[in-house]
Amino acid sequence: MALQAASLVSPALSIPKEGKSSVCLKDSSLFGISFSDHLKSEFSSSTLRCKRELNQQIGAIRAQTTATESPAVNKATPDGKKTLRKGSVVITGASSGLGLATAKALAETGKWHVIMACRDFLKAERAAKSAGITKENYTVMHLDLASLDSVRQFVDNFRQSGRPLDVLVCNAAVYLPTAKEPTFTAEGFELSVGTNHLGHFLLSRLLLEDLNKSSYPSKRLIIVGSITGNTNTLAGNVPPKANLGDLRGLAGGLNGLKSSMIDGGEFDGAKAYKDSKVCNMLTMQEFHKRYHEETGITFASLYPGCIATTGLFREHIPLFRILFPPFQKFITQGYVSEDEAGKRLAQVVSEPSLTKSGVYWSWNKNSASFENQLSQEASDAEKARKVWELSEKLVGLA
């Protein structure tokens, strides 16, 4: 934009950043020859007209630039080298826990602008400030995944902001392990699956178009999974185990009239969360199957480790919250801090070595990433297709 504006300016007229003309009549002379008041008046009037016209032209250029996508490579640099522009990443649930730690890790590099998509605007602003994220590296936007109308409004607001979308991270989650009765989203879906899966499903589908338009070298859509939904692990076999069954509950709308559980069974808050994570991992694979080859977008899921002190467990019984962190630290040794987990998710967002699509990433005890295996159900291609098609109907895309 600066280059375009400069081309409109006559070489004899310099316009500083403030938009003030460098032409000055304070001395009322030119090469030692005094101006008459009449000439000074005419010259000043001409200068003002020139300034107004120039400002109008620059304003038009700014408007055109705002309406177009920012190129991934900035052409104008002091040393003449091409540089990659700052990436733009949307992270849901970025006001606490893993989401906030990831936002911090990315913002600290100075290479990313983080859109913190959160339900509580003020909480997100306070969290960003507390984490030391500088204002130029983040924007808070309202998003309530328990309302499909809110999801659509977020997409509209994001597009109106004029920002490109280079990476989408679906991180937010509801976990209600002690709930005896189901609660529901604005549209009447069981809250855990409605938020963790259906809200993210609609968000991802709508923003896929924006991701595809990005000129960034490595566009990515990342959905956070969980070991608890992966029944080929020890943690995944702790009752109640994830099991989507024949999807009769999902087909029925999860509204409680028949069943609020995906498999059509009795409500169980812990199982509802685990089932939603299976849906997340199935959705990632179906995105990869349908869109990776066509768009070049990397679709991935991950389990960053057990963040035993995260607020995700705030609804658990007090004894669990006391005993679970030391159990993970000293017995299973699967514990990771929020900061470490955030750095791992940030790797999946930005590392050139983690661009393989259709992968479920995990980390070993040496903090090295590797492609993990999903359970039979979480990698069932036919079930992934059915979950996709039923979800399309529930969110109004089919």
UniProtKB/Swiss-Prot annotation:
Molecular functions per Gene Ontology: protochlorophyllide reductase activity
UniProtKB keywords: Chlorophyll biosynthesis, Chloroplast, NADP, Oxidoreductase, Photosynthesis, Plastid, Transit peptide
Enzyme Commission identifier(s): 1.3.1.33
An annotated GO BP: photosynthesis
Gene3D superfamilies: NAD(P)-binding Rossmann-like Domain
Catalytic activity: chlorophyllide a + NADP(+) = protochlorophyllide a + NADPH + H(+)
Pfam families named among the record's database cross-references: adh_short
Pathway(s) this gene product operates in, as recorded in its UniProt entry: Porphyrin-containing compound metabolism; chlorophyll biosynthesis
One GO cellular component, as annotated: chloroplast
InterPro entries: NAD(P)-bd_dom_sf (IPR036291), Prochl_reduct (IPR005979), SDR_fam (IPR002347)
NCBIfam families: LPOR
Family the entry assigns: Belongs to the short-chain dehydrogenases/reductases (SDR) family. POR subfamily.
The protein, known as: Protochlorophyllide reductase, chloroplastic
Organism ancestry: Eukaryota, Viridiplantae, Streptophyta, Embryophyta, Tracheophyta
